[in-house]
Amino acid sequence: MQDAAPRLTFTLRDEERLMMKIGVFVPIGNNGWLISTHAPQYMPTFELNKAIVQKAEHYHFDFALSMIKLRGFGGKTEFWDHNLESFTLMAGLAAVTSRIQIYATAATLTLPPAIVARMAATIDSISGGRFGVNLVTGWQKPEYEQMGIWPGDDYFSRRYDYLTEYVQVLRDLWGSGKSDFKGDFFTMDDCRVSPQPSVPMKVICAGQSDAGMAFSARYADFNFCFGKGVNTPTAFAPTAARMKQAAEQTGRDVGSYVLFMVIADETDDAARAKWEHYKAGADEEALSWLTEQSQKDTRSDTDTNVRQMADPTSAVNINMGTLVGSYASVARMLDEVASVPGAEGVLLTFDDFLSGIENFGERIQPLMQCRAHLPALTQEVA
């Protein structure tokens, strides 16, 4: 592998188009996103996530997102068996940050929409208008079955009908403070929420299937998708094109934000050695659990998030796109991501979050043309 990567050159018009948002996918579950005995082993804590998000804010990251996970994969690493809760975590992080956008994830089978509307309005107040909600339908049956709230396997084929009603109730309550919505899943009777958010509440999703993208095209402000492969930064382009086409049919602009893991070092070879080490320690027992759960949904197409997560190609980090290389190589590849039509941002994970974000801010981001608009750093990280 080459140590240094050539910089891409863009015209001014291209640079304007390629101003890309950067977010951090905070490790709300143990061990982050590496299912490996060779990866850093750690528990999720508020203090860890506080340090991560404050460091990300210092380096001008645009947003931070936490997932929700209610049951893990087990194995030697007890992968994702230990998780914080998304809304309460992000409420705490909203109180200790000042600029970065904050997103929590609602597991919509567990929380009535009127409660989510009120919690979101509360965190909007805490954050000064920096909060938004990521809506997920739920795919891992044991998460909900353990609590007695799994609605039955026909939910796999009706989940976006459910989510459509859910978001309509949210929009009613955030918009006017009142909802009388009547549907198959929800019935509101003069339901009230006040105070309302100080700014329009952003809703984000991660639809990969046709049904998921159609939902995002109608209701989401942007849509997450998986990057694909190792050091193939534009391989997600067909997914972004599908999202762009779906949004055009609704007359809305819904950009794609792409999930990548960054494994960087001084040289390409050093970064590659870390990646190979993580793969060699893959927790096969935990990965078997993931594969088993991905096969439970027999009613959805093969393009769903969980099917990609369980693909054996790079299951050690749930098959998110992986950028492995020197700081210059990673910067070049992220500029390539920004060149894909419809790609408006990336959501990043790291093998080691604290050092990864610092290296990104100090060594990678300054080389990225799609981040050249940022001001110079003027203060130390707390």
From Swiss-Prot:
EC number(s) given by UniProt: 1.14.99.46
Catalytic EC class: oxidoreductase
Biological process terms in GO annotation: alkanesulfonate catabolic process; nitrogen utilization; uracil catabolic process
SUPFAM superfamilies from the UniProt entry: Bacterial luciferase-like (SSF51679)
Pfam families, per the entry: Bac_luciferase (PF00296)
Catalysis performed (reactions): uracil + FMNH2 + NADH + O2 = (Z)-3-ureidoacrylate + FMN + NAD(+) + H2O + H(+); thymine + FMNH2 + NADH + O2 = (Z)-2-methylureidoacrylate + FMN + NAD(+) + H2O + H(+)
Binding site for FMN: 68-69, 134, 143, 159-160, 209
Superkingdom, natural source: Bacteria
InterPro entries: Luciferase-like_dom (IPR011251), Luciferase-like_sf (IPR036661), Pyrimidine_monooxygenase_RutA (IPR019914), SsuD_RutA_monooxygenase (IPR050172)
Induction info: Up-regulated by the nitrogen regulatory protein C (NtrC also called GlnG) and repressed by RutR.
Entry keywords, A to Z: Flavoprotein, FMN, Monooxygenase, NADP, Oxidoreductase
GO MF: alkanesulfonate monooxygenase activity; uracil oxygenase activity
PANTHER family per UniProt: ALKANESULFONATE MONOOXYGENASE, ALKANESULFONATE MONOOXYGENASE-RELATED
Family affiliation: Belongs to the NtaA/SnaA/DszA monooxygenase family. RutA subfamily.
Function: The FMN-N(5)-oxide reacts spontaneously with NADH to produce FMN. Requires the flavin reductase RutF to regenerate FMN in vivo.
Protein name (database record): Pyrimidine monooxygenase RutA
